[in-house]
Amino acid sequence: MIKFLLLIFTAAIVFNTNARAQQYVLYGNITDQQNKPVPFASVYIKNSSYGSTANENGDYLFKLSPGSYVAIYRFVGYKERVVKITITNHDEHMNVQLSDDLFVLADVKAKKNDLSDPATAIMRRVISKREYYLNEVKSYSSVEYIKGVKLIVSSPKTLLAREMAKLLNLDTAGRGISYQSESLSTFSFEQPDKVKEVFIASKSAGSNPPFGYNKASDLQVNFYNNLFIVDGLSSHGFVSPVAARAFTYYTYKLLGTIVQDGKKIDKIQVIPKLNALAFTGCIYIMEDDWRIYSVDLMLTKAKNNLNFVDTLKVSQQYIPIKNNVWEPLSFQYKYTGSVQGFKYSGYYLGITNNYKIDTTFRKDYFSGEILHVDTEANKRDAAFWAYSRPVPLTTAEARNYKTKDSISGLKEYTVYLDSMHHADNKLKILPYLIKGYLTTSITGKDSLYLYPLLQTVYYNTVEGYGIYLRARYSRTFDDNRSYSITPTLRYGFADKLFSANLHTTYTYDQAHAGKFFLNFGSDMPDLNSLGTRSLYFNTLSSLISEQNFVKYYRSEFGDIGYQRELVNGVLWYANISYANRTQLYNTSFNHIFSYSDRHYTSNNPLAPNAPEDDRSILFPQNKALTFNTFIKFTFDQQYITRPTGKIYLPSKYPVITVNYRKGINGVLGSDVDYDFASLQVEQDYVPMGLLGHSAFRITAGDFFNRKTLYFMDYNHFLGNQGTTADPTYVGSFHFLPFYTFSTADPFFEAHYQHNFAGALFDNIPLLKKLKLEEIVGANYLSEKINPNYSEFYFGIKRLIYGADYGVSYQGNKKYLQGFRIFYGLR
């Protein structure tokens, strides 16, 4: 099907509505009455779904076959201009001048007995038809063109800024285009929310900004929806002026009425009642039909807590398609912003053509793939783009492409590659200390990563001071195959134990998550298989706070695993492992500070009150042959297919994981004999409209055969001790001890967290500017020795940082309470 679409697309060359033997260009400039350009004015051919938009200079172009046409020129604030055009056997030049709209106040049919502003009655009629227009078109297909440009309009005079200006190829005044992009795609839609886009061509120059959209689905904005939501722009949505509850958020004022092509168009000012969640600007309504004709709205950082931009102007133009059905021809984000003294502006423009309403799709057409990127999409040449783009480039944009294309061509030369490779791979001590060091080959197919130097030296009470060396080598064969090898060396100076292991992963089918795993060697694992604290943080808590939270054991192991997506949304994983496991004891008791109210605890987590040099038995030395498998079901799994592989998107529905683990007795001397099964239901993002979003995780399990198993085989929980917690992961506890409640009996745990996404703080002026997100949550656990454990917490977060206060209970008795913080590390 994809190949078929590519053939159709190439034959049509994007925006050709009636393929004929020869096409000619209708081109010109659109100006106002002062002969100033009208940027982004809409142009379309009457009785067709073929349209375009002028560029920033008011220049436009069409490709038309010989014949007679009626072209309509439109832009918000100007009278619609209708021009008859005849294309013969040559290109036609047509400059068009638009005159200002003169909206006049007059009687409005919708007014009736409403004594308030007539706009109120008009908007009631529009809102009453909101759902009808939202669901009017059951399906359609179209061709989409997306263009984005970001300009640096001024730069600071610092040395760093000058270096940045050179990097961005700005002029001597620190101005210029830092990023531009174009894309062409086919787009398909079916009610209620099925979409599929096929990327045919893509071109960009510069680094993609954080506020960036280059695919059609990013700009499929429908104001008939209750909320206007743009990923990355804000942690919450904004109320549409025609939302079901719009009168709670807006008042309206009729500015006047004009007649366009025999239809009355009302210009209505949108006035927010609150300083958040709402637009300002104007919306244009077609009387009698009571539908949106166009929108010209704005959001500001000061009132709406926007990310990345200071202002965002949203414009949309509707045109008739057929049978009185109107759909958007063009959509535009126009923005301004500043960061570190750099001031910038830009826009994203979307043009929709070749609408085919009520299209019938194959039953399996919407299979979960919402975007398919053709392998040739990034390889289209200048001739293709010169013919296919519906909006002409400005002189500055053409020059920017040429400059950056020449730089890209330079990068193919060996000398350039060698110099850039040397610069990129230069070892820098401070980044290596904290983030590690990554070096890549000239081709980018080979890479070597050295883990952070900060993790190289560690301390715990079992090994004393130790050395931990870890690296990862990766090689990519092609877009579908790669492998990685991670060797690790570890030595404790107190217990004199040397560990060495190798973890390998071979990806053979990236598109279907097909992988093999092979791991073997010796290590010092955490008794809690979910992990408790990193080597680094356990070192800090041990030496500074005299709290040795992590408990270790010795494992000499080997395992092999496999995973693959069986069908879309069903992932299967299986592995079998063999390990010789030995209990370990404390051998070192160093610390920087001493505390009268606490001391180091035993490495036996079930003997918390034993002395630090305790040698009580937690488990005998044993051998374990273990089989583990799970199947994860993601319903209506959506994904993006790129040449480099498959990208899975968060599910709109709960994800279900069924897990089974078997301790196999008697084979290779294995001592274990148990069967464990669990069921997990989770969802990371549950939208709650203007009130933010929720997440939850519920897990239940049991050992239905528990003849022989040891502490590390138990079911463990992601507990927390100390002052740090992880609010970004719903599934962890705030106050639960790491090991105390690990169980070989039935258990049930539940976690819930709600993020209000600023819905509360946005109403408090001083707090609003901080962009804080309000968090509330609860955790629950029921198992044999702890049948009714619960936690409740509330707090704030911003990006990866957070702080909250919580309290926990065992039954009706308060257990622990206090503050927890998180700053990106655990």
Which stretches of residues belong to each language-model region?
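Structured extracytoplasmic
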Residues: 113-265, 272-278, 340-342, 346-458, ...
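Conserved "repeat-terminator" motif of extracellular CCP/Sushi domains
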Residues: 94-104, 109-113
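Short, acidic Ser/Thr/Gly-rich low-complexity loop/linker segments typical of extracellular
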Residues: 48-59
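Exposed, low-structure sequence patches enriched in small/polar residues
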Residues: 371-491, 495-826
